[in-house]
Structure formats: C-alpha cells, structure tokens
Amino acid sequence: MPINAIRTCFRWLEYEYSRHALDQSIVRAISDEEIQEAIECGEIIEDYPADKYGPSCLILGLTREQRPLHIQCTYPQLNTVKVITLYQPDPERWIDFRKRRLQ
C-alpha cells in the first residue's frame, strides 16, 4: 500500500524536493524523468518511521536505461510526498543495491 500511495502522488505531480534533494539531483545529473521512472517500478527497501521530516522510506528503482537510484522520500502527507535525498547507490556499499554491506 505505501509504495502505491507514493506512486500515485508522483503520477499526479503531488511531490516536492527538499533543497538538499534538488542540489543532489543537479550534482549527480539525475533528471526528474529518471526519478519518476524509478518510483514507478521501485520498491521500498528501508523504512524510517522516526525521520526528522516525518515517516519516510528509501526506495530502490531503475530508470528506463536501467540506472539504479535510491530515493528517500516521506510517506504521503496531505497528498504530497517530499523527496529528501537521491543518489545512485555505490555497489561497494550495497548488495544488489538493496542491502547495506557491513563496514
């Protein structure tokens, strides 16, 4: 259910970026279109119920070009999702981009 609610917000363009996420999308050359593609096929891989922005999650999704993206966003609040941060996961730090490697 939560991923479907997040997808619905993205389909209806009911989302916004934190300043950090906007900066990171520019620095890491991640387009809005790629973010939408990743959310559409994505899965929640981590849950952050006590995050400072409110309950949020980490989504792993692939773009049309098969680029893996991690997108941390809030669960819908007042029909809006806030993207907190986003990045292309480092395979040295993630197993199959889904599970954190032990350091």
Positions of PLM-derived features:
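Ribonuclease/tRNase effector modules and their secretory precursors
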Residues: 1-103
